Each structure stands twice: as C-alpha cells, then as structure tokens.
Amino acid sequence: MSGQFEHGDVDVALLTPETTPPTLHTRQLFNEEYVCLLSENHPLAGSATLSLDEFCAQDHALVSWPGGNFHGVTDLALAAIGRARRVTLSVCSFLTLPEILRVTDLVSVVPKRLAVDTTGLVMLPPPLVIPGFSKIMAWHNRTHHHKGHVWLRERLASVAKTVVY
C-alpha cells in the first residue's frame, strides 16, 4: 500500500492501526465495538440479552468482504472459550445484511456503528467479549501539508465524530 500512496494512486485510506504502514501519517477516527443484530420478529428479539448457549444455537450471517468466508472475529472469540457458532450465510457487504436479517431468523454480529437506524431490527449485546477495533485515517507525507488534502482529512475526522450511538 505504501507504493500506492507514493505514486498518488491513494490519497487517504481508512485502515486499522495494525495494517497501516509505519511510513504514513495517521489520525485516530474512532474505536468500534460489536453488537448482535436480529429481526424484531426473531423468537429471541424480546430478550434483553442472549445467553451464550442461545447465541451459539442460532443460525448466523457473516459479512466477509471477499465473500464466501464463514469464519470471523466472533468465531475466534468463541474458539478461545471452547465454543462455536453455526454460520449459514456469508455476504460480501453490510448493505445487504439488514434486509436479509429482517426476513429471516438469522443473527449477525456487526460493528455497532452499522447497527444504527436499522428499522425492523433489534440490537443486543453479544454474550461474550468480542474484541473491537480502531479505525484510523492514513496519508503520505507528499500530501501532508496540501490544503485540499488537509481540508478532506478534517471533514473525514469531523464526520467520524458525529456518528454516535
């Protein structure tokens, strides 16, 4: 990715700190946590919480940007405590997930920021600790003082702060 910045193919990227080349400038945007999302018509939608047994017994949907992956951060957290879940659907975008959840009894674990404004869905805390993540914005020294780029980075930081839940 460093080469893409150096050649001007990428101006700003939203990354996690772990995936950011150390040669780039960075700015923290937000810290994210995970929640469970399910249809308001799901049999467990009236619960204030899900037990670990209930959670593991459900059919789950997973978002995997390359598509087809049936294993994610939730599965790593479950494996650490000797448990597993049943992922029966993998989609490549969070954009399609809410509609799928509305019309099925699938449960999904999603970043909390993406569970805001989801009519017909219920948000519940996960029954186990699922490590969240941080998002940062990164840019190359080539554009560090460029007024247009500074403006863009300020707008991105401002928008990241306005998303509250």
Residue ranges and their predicted role:
Residues 44-46, 50-52, 58-81, 145-149, ...:
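Secondary-structure junction motif
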Residues 8-9, 32, 47, 57-58, ...:
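Structured helix-beta-strand junction loops
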Residues 47, 52, 123-165:
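A late-sequence structural motif
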Residues 1-2, 90-97:
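Short helix-initiation/N-cap motifs at beta->coil->alpha
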Residues 4-6, 55, 99-102, 137:
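Hydrophobic residues within well-ordered alpha-helices
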Residues 10-23, 72, 80, 94-122:
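A ligand-binding cleft/hinge motif common to bilobed small-molecule-binding domains
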Residues 1-38, 120-126:
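Short beta-strand-centered segments that line the small-molecule binding cleft or hinge
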Residues 24-40, 48, 52-57, 126-135:
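Short Pro/Gly-enriched coil loops immediately N-terminal to beta-strands
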